[in-house]
Amino acid sequence: DDRKFLHKLDLLDFPGARSREKYKEQDIHTVLPKILRRGKVAYLFNKYSRSLRISSVLFCHHNDQKAEATIGETINSWIEDNIGSTPEERANMLNDTNGIAPLFFVATKFNIDLERTKTDNSSNIDKLDTHWNRFDTVFPEIIKPNKWLDNWVKTGGLFRTAAFQNIYPLRDFYWSGKNGVFDGYSDGAVKSEEKSVHTYADYPDYFENLKQSFLKNAFVQRHFANPEQTWNDVATINNDGSKAIIRNLDAIASVLEDARKKKYLAQLAKIKSEMYNALSVYF
């Protein structure tokens, strides 16, 4: 009952998806396994995507992915085919999906963003903003050269902002405990849940200061509809961010198929009209 979306959606993983890389012919014998592996993932995604069988995408990226080859064009092509190529088209589609985009950006390893660094102390609170660098560097790198992150939908009705707002931080319970974010969790022989936020004797207000830094961050304020709720979903005891993803998957699952049919039927009607207009001059 807590995974209602599974009654409507099937899950298919495309691990390690990347865009194309360039190799010299003389190096083919050393890079062939990598080419085949990446080609297999790309082929499967493109095959399902072109047949309109991928209704939603959960794109997972970690906190330091800017050096990796990106798949911006692959994601953008899927958006154009399944949601819309303009803010107006996307708004029309999302009006039928409770305002939730079927593209989920999942910011994994968010526990790393929450970890205290060597330079974090009560005398330089302003520098805590560097914990959210992934939003200013990784995100634009992923989708470049496209600009839809800030021009996602036409405002009005369900949409109070034009910005893309379907981003979900996700952390790992084990590493949150291992690296001093929360205390109490164990997945060993004796299981236990998180008991408390880790407190530093020399900086007891660290986590509260970090929270305020998150809430005041310009990217967060623009791209999270409710920053306080997002923080509570991912950075409170025994909440790793997954419940927010499940909540919105549940909200979209029951209406997504009808919304897709409506969009594709409208596209077919447009094609029919254009063909009729083109041929009518000859008859």
Cite the ranges covered by each PLM segment.
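Conserved GTPase G-domain substructure that encodes guanine base recognition and part of the catalytic core
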Residues: 37-57, 61-282
